Amino acid sequence: MPLLNISTNRKIKNEKELLSKSSYFISSTLNKPENFVMIKLTDGLMMHFAGTNEHCCFIEIKSIGSINSENISKPICEFFSSELQIPPERIYIFFQEVDSNMWAWNNQTFG
């Protein structure tokens, strides 16, 4: 909590650096403690978007509590566009708010 899932057809050369930067960025953006941030990065995928196989990215953010998607969509898109060198019009972001009783860690749910 939160979970950031990054899927892209671009091959990432500096995976560990991207994971570290993304962890700090998402923690700050969502105002959540970084020690609870989990990131899943899947690169080099076969992806097709807007009629082409050009570089694209799907960002999925799941978090307990309210997500102000209107306010954070732009900075998230800008961050990943810059880090992955993918135009913002080739990035989808999916937000999902999760009830605290549906997310568990260390033998118990958060709610």
Predicted features along the sequence, with ranges:
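Interaction-mediating elements
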Residues: 1-111
